[in-house]
Amino acid sequence: MNISHPYRYAHFTNGIPYHKYFISQSDQSGGKIFGSEFKFDFQEDYNNVTHTIDVFIGDRKECILITIEEDNKKVAHIQNFHYHETCDLYKKLPRISGTRILMKTALEYISLEKRIKKVTLTDKAVFTHKSDKIQLFILYLFKYGESYYQKNFGFKYMKKIDQITQAENMKIREKHFINKKKVKKELLQYFAKEKVERFLEFIEESQLISEFVKNFTCLNNLFDIYFAFLKYEFKDKKYNNLFEEVLYKKLK
């Protein structure tokens, strides 16, 4: 990530010119990076076409890709993040805990570049049970009131730059966030009694369970209804960019 890395040489990939920059640290050697008791390959490529530094941790296709724009080295973007047991060199990365180890390793690696002050990502993960699928983002919101990356790594929602002042923002919060029970009641009125009971049972449970996805596959529709309810409440397009924050506050 730093163009002053000592092991710099030019090479070509698919005809596109790159430069590699390997970090030289006491706890790393030979293009390896350590995370807990696991070891991962890493590679940094400079892409002259996109003008980004592309950092691969683990397998180039299956694990993590981080990009840093050449003209904005304060921000790192995690473009791909996929768990696979072969991501570490010993090919035995465990499920669940291995996912967290892989991400923490990537964040620690990013922290070696002192200029980077912000890390962004988009959660597109899907939780699958047999033929049923649901976005992990939605499942965690309804279960914990936080997304997966909020709960496990401290990420925060990004909000578009808007003209809303801090005073206006606080006024909106006071109006729409205080009476949570009323909002929950309004939301649950959209569903049949048995679905409401199943939903209430689910949010009381302590762990994510695949049976929920099997028996309550309308959760994606519920999420859409919740958005529609919020849009009806706000009645103003300039507040649309606060919907994710509203969901987080309401379901916490």
Predicted regions, residues:
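Non-catalytic substrate-recognition and accessory regions of acyl/acetyltransferase enzymes
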Residues: 1-97, 101-252
